[in-house]
Amino acid sequence: MSNNYSIDLKQGPSLLYVIPIKPVVLAVQLGAILFQFKSIYDFEYNFVGDLVFRTFVIFLSLTSFTAFLFNQKILMKAHLVMAIFLLAGPIACLQYLVFDFYRAEFHGDNNLKWDHTSSFENYLIFILVILLAVALGSYTWLCHLLIEGLDEKNAPKRRPQCKICSNHYVVPENEKLIYNIA
């Protein structure tokens, strides 16, 4: 097997210098794939297009899972762009809910009929949409950190220019001097 397709879950950046990011991202993706497989069996199909669309989404999810598993940078970046576009949905929904709630409370005009729901349900909707937006944003940030870590791993090491940073630089064997300069 070539070096490009190595599966090392601990390589790359870590969260708080303790938790490697790659297993967290892969676990979230695997959970999403399992949820999509489960939703295929629970969904009532009105026409074949529904089944084809859901199968295509599962194929895209499996492709992004293998891209993150084998460090395929182009597919990882495509998945990141898709996640950013998907993040716009909960944010737009949250903005709509906030503006509609404001309009219902202060102007008496509402589209979502807040009068028929309890205040607990209103707050639950807000909390769930906020949690969804935070979860998608955190996942997108972790994917971005993983791609940046892959870029830094492949980048050539440069010698630091200042004396303060030179203590942290590991000199390669081919650049070491014969005599130590103190």
UniProtKB/Swiss-Prot annotation:
A Pfam family per the record: DUF5373
Superkingdom of the organism of origin: Eukaryota
Official protein name in the record: Uncharacterized protein C48B4.9
Source organism (scientific name): Caenorhabditis elegans
Taxonomic lineage of the native organism: Eukaryota, Metazoa, Ecdysozoa, Nematoda, Chromadorea
